[in-house]
Amino acid sequence: MAQVSMRDMLNAGVHFGHQTRYWNPQMKPYIFGARNGVHIINLEKTLPLFNDALAELTRIASNNGKILFVGTKRAASDAVKAAAVESQQFYVNHRWLGGMLTNWKTVRQSIKRLKDLEAQSQDGTFDKLTKKEALDRTRDMAKLELSLGGIKDMAGLPDAIFVIGADYEHIAIKEANNLGIPVFAIVDTNASPAGVNHVIPGNDDAARAIQLYLDAAVAAIKEGRGQETVAAEFVAEEAAE
């Protein structure tokens, strides 16, 4: 079973929140105290919440559910893409376009445009165009790939979203709420947990913490998809560190 330990979280700096003056009072139940003007997150609260969230991710994955990773801030972007690719899931890591979930019909048309351009770039169509036309289409394709590349094969709405940074990705959370899609989110001390079904109180800025969340989520998903050996290796590696 994919799980994290208190030591894993301490080593990754999950407990470091934001400066106290930026706090969101809704996070009070998850805060241990403050040190040098920075809120410290109570990992005794985070630990069971995180492991419960991982168990639910495993359950969703075991039913062939689609999980969309969302993390567009610079610290999370590359790691979010890597986690989605490794777990054969989906991602948005550049910019959340308004309506990405709630206006799926329009998004689907943009995805079709992206796939058409990809096909044209492979079948020789671009070679028959003028230099300017080919350049314009190449730019269009790159722009669409940046925004939609992580969801172009999703074929419908996701069954859950896993968000790095509830405050930063509030539009994605609101859209998921409107559609009844379960939200798993890392919620720092400056953010609101409202609208998050599975709150994971933790540092959403540190690279090591972000990597821990994503590695654990990947292990949980792989376990649900019947790849238990990989999930077991994750637990063993984390315990050894």
Swiss-Prot record:
Membrane-crossing segments per the record: none
Pfam families per UniProt: Ribosomal_S2
Gene from which this protein is expressed: rpsB
Keywords: Ribonucleoprotein, Ribosomal protein
Keyword Ribonucleoprotein: yes
NCBIfam families: rpsB_bact (TIGR01011)
GO cellular component: cytosolic small ribosomal subunit
Name of the featured protein: Small ribosomal subunit protein uS2
Highest taxon above the source species: Bacteria
Recorded GO MF terms: structural constituent of ribosome
PANTHER family: 30S RIBOSOMAL PROTEIN S2 PROKARYOTIC AND ORGANELLAR (PTHR12534), SMALL RIBOSOMAL SUBUNIT PROTEIN US2M (PTHR12534:SF0)
The family this protein is said to belong to: Belongs to the universal ribosomal protein uS2 family.
Any one GO biological process: translation
